[in-house]
Amino acid sequence: MENLLSVKDLSKQQILDLLALAKAVKANPAEYSQALAGKSIVTIYEKPSLRTRVTFDIGIHKLGGHAVYLDAQNGAIGERETVKDFAANISRWADAIVARVVSHKTLEGLVEHGSVPVVNSLCDLYHPCQALADFLTISEHYEDVSKVKLAYVGEGNNVTHSLMLTGAILGAEVTAVCPRGSSPDAQIVKQAMALAEISGGKINVTDNLDAIVDYDVIYGDTWVSMGDDTPLAQVKEKYMPYQINKALLMRTGIKHVLHCQPAHRELEITSEVMDGEHSLIFDQAENRMHAQNAVLLTLLK
């Protein structure tokens, strides 16, 4: 593994190795406290962030490394200078680049013109670190992730794409339940289905919640993306039937709940569920750090 732009670039064994390493780092942090000693990692944020920034900054520190934060003003890639020059300069100083960007093309440019590993911490198409944290969380409750049935409910987006691709590679069953007109990208769904054929997994896209009866895990995400100015009344009209609430859990028999956050309580998920016995949401948030640490350790070993 030279970079992490999308989980589709990883093999099943590479994903399992990352999950195993994440568990090891989580269980024995002292053993890895100097694993990145002398390493400097530039973290770039074109979009606002809480979990991504904090988990990378603290995670790098816990591994003995040094994180340098660049926001959209100081790291305006392609505006103050070209992606080519940006990548070439950063590569002379830093040991790796972690980038949360608007466009996947920016990440491809950083890889093409830089000479250090690049980690996608979110773009328009994928959110690989999130998906690794999600399956790390699932693996803490299910011994064989290939037998897990995971339902994503809401708008098809970068998180949906990465969940489908990761599940497909691992041999799991992943169903995206989205309102009509809000399905995940058709080309990425096709890629996930092809990967599932190889692994024995299954990928489904539907607008029918009856399709996820007897599933193991349900996953929610915000209905309103950053910068989306759609009136709330319109959003609620379209998505309220897909709210993750106690009634839906009882109807489907689903045991565990995930949400990548930020969560809009009483919209895509109720407080009763988010704070209830079925929720793994804050374990999932913690696991962002451990999964990302495993990625950095693998890239910089």
From Swiss-Prot:
Catalytic activity from the UniProt record: carbamoyl phosphate + L-ornithine = L-citrulline + phosphate + H(+)
Function: Reversibly catalyzes the transfer of the carbamoyl group from carbamoyl phosphate (CP) to the N(epsilon) atom of ornithine (ORN) to produce L-citrulline.
Membership in a protein family: Belongs to the aspartate/ornithine carbamoyltransferase superfamily. OTCase family.
Pfam family, one: OTCace_N
Residues holding L-ornithine: 158, 221, 225-226
Keyword Transferase part of the UniProt annotation: yes
Pathway in which the depicted protein is active: Amino-acid biosynthesis; L-arginine biosynthesis; L-arginine from L-ornithine and carbamoyl phosphate: step 1/3
Protein's UniProt name: Ornithine carbamoyltransferase
Organism superkingdom: Bacteria
Keyword Endoplasmic reticulum: no
GO cellular component, one term: cytoplasm
Enzyme Commission number, as recorded: 2.1.3.3
GO-annotated biological processes: arginine biosynthetic process via ornithine; citrulline biosynthetic process; L-arginine biosynthetic process
Protein residues bound to carbamoyl phosphate: 100, 127-130, 260, 288
InterPro entries hit by this protein: Asp/Orn_carbamoyltranf_P-bd, Asp/Orn_carbamoylTrfase, Asp/Orn_carbamoylTrfase_sf, Asp_carbamoyltransf_Asp/Orn-bd, Orn/put_carbamltrans, OTCase_ArgI
Keyword list, A-Z: Amino-acid biosynthesis, Arginine biosynthesis, Cytoplasm, Transferase
Any one GO MF annotation of this record: ornithine carbamoyltransferase activity
